[in-house]
Each structure stands twice: as C-alpha cells, then as structure tokens.
C-alpha cells in the first residue's frame, strides 16, 4: 500500500481539527493552549510539504522552514510568558495575564 496525497491531507486535517478543538476546549491552561497552536502549525506544515511533493515544487518545503522559524520564536516567547506568569502569580491560568503589569 502506498501513501497518496489524500492520506497526508486527511492526517493533516485530523491534526488541525485536534489543535482547534484543543484551543476551544481549554482556554485557561497556557501550556495546552501553546501545544494546540503548535499542533495547528504542524498540520499546516504537513499539508505544505504534501502539496509541494505532489506537484514537484520545492517552494512549499522552503516555506515550511520559515513557518518553523516563526513557530520556534512563538514557542520561546510563549514559554517565557508562562515562566513569568508562574513566578509572579503561581498559576498558569490565561485569565490571570491581565494581573501582570509592567
């Protein structure tokens, strides 16, 4: 059995749906929110790679590197905010972010 474009797109859609479901289901925990956003970005990246491989164009695969760079920066900033939130308020609840002033 060979994997076709449809297999990759279905897997990407499932990952995307799980990520969106995680964002809407849990809006309080910052760690789960960041993981869900990363899962959505992973699904989009997988679709880019699948389409670029299917059409024989390398532009989609190059674009994935830019998305991964932005995702790494987003994860680093998100984790820095998480550490700051936990140090100051002893919680990782997103609703408590407005209590940080400075």
From Swiss-Prot:
Gene3D superfamilies: 1.10.287.3510. It catalyses: a quinone + NADH + 5 H(+)(in) = a quinol + NAD(+) + 4 H(+)(out). Its main location: membrane. It is found in: Cell inner membrane. GO terms for biological process: ATP synthesis coupled electron transport. One of its GO terms (cellular component) is plasma membrane. GO terms for molecular function: NADH:ubiquinone reductase (non-electrogenic) activity; quinone binding. Coiled coil: none annotated. Its EC number is 7.1.1.-. The chain crosses the membrane at residues 5-25, 31-51, 62-82. Keywords: Cell inner membrane, Cell membrane, Membrane, NAD, Quinone, Translocase, Transmembrane, Transmembrane helix, Transport, Ubiquinone. InterPro entries: NADH_UbQ_OxRdtase_chain4L/K (IPR001133), NUOK/Mnh_C1-like (IPR039428). It is a multi-pass membrane protein. NDH-1 shuttles electrons from NADH, via FMN and iron-sulfur (Fe-S) centers, to quinones in the respiratory chain. The immediate electron acceptor for the enzyme in this species is believed to be ubiquinone. Couples the redox reaction to proton translocation (for every two electrons transferred, four hydrogen ions are translocated across the cytoplasmic membrane), and thus conserves the redox energy in a proton gradient. NDH-1 is composed of 14 different subunits. Subunits NuoA, H, J, K, L, M, N constitute the membrane sector of the complex. PANTHER family: NADH DEHYDROGENASE SUBUNIT 4L-RELATED, NADH-UBIQUINONE OXIDOREDUCTASE SUBUNIT ND4L. Belongs to the complex I subunit 4L family. HAMAP family: NDH1_NuoK. This is NADH-quinone oxidoreductase subunit K.
